[in-house]
Amino acid sequence: MTFLENVDKAKLRKILLIVISALALIALALLLVIIVVSIAPGSLKKSDIKYVDYTVSEKDISMGTLILADDAHPFTAGQALNSTMINCQQYRNQNRGDVEKGPYYAMNNVQLTQTAAAAAHKLLVAAENAVKEDNLLIKYAFYGDDGKTVEFQTGMLMFLTDYEETKLPEGYAAWFKEHAHEYGFVESYTDAYRYVDEAHAKYMTDNKLSLADYIAYLKKETSRDTVLSLQDANGNKYAVYYVACKAGDKISVPETEEYTISGTNEGGVIVTVKITK
């Protein structure tokens, strides 16, 4: 064997070692990508939550931020909400001060649930600060609705317009489409925004899902064992799953984590778990 042949074999071994190392690094990178994608917000993953039994109440079934209300799903809990509604104009005045100055206005008889009213106030103040146009009105909500849209009865839907009650100004319309989810709202139909909570609003907006479509997706794809991993606009993380049930049934809920239950008005509930670890 010549000296040249020895040199060539040494080079070949070195090249093979480099190739093998490169392939190993590529394989490791692909594995990391798979791991990251599998746990990324907005993806399905196997649940590692420790559960306990919980008996579902009638309130759990019939109320909540994800309750479906349309012609096919009549909302029957409206009367029960009466005493808990917040007048939007009064809330605006109490939290802004001088009624002669902005931000938005609301028709005297429109109301929202306490949670939706607080979120709507933050949303509308942020909108006026960004658009800098004093011309924003809540025309319809729980009371003073249009008499046609069942969803107003939930106390979580508001219809927005200008002071002339004609249409939402273009600047506001564009801003709401981009930022409403940051405050827990999604566009139900043109210029009408429904509160669904921050945990769900970003995912629904990013994936262009109506509330009905979102519920159908959760019903098909999730369970206590397979949850949807979500992250809201503020970086808070959640695990979400659907359970088909009726009042009196036992379902699984987290033993230690903070969670909420929302009825869907179509045969089940959605459990939203706040992930802190």
What is each model feature region?
Residues T2-K277:
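Extracytoplasmic cell-surface/polysaccharide-interacting catalytic and binding patches
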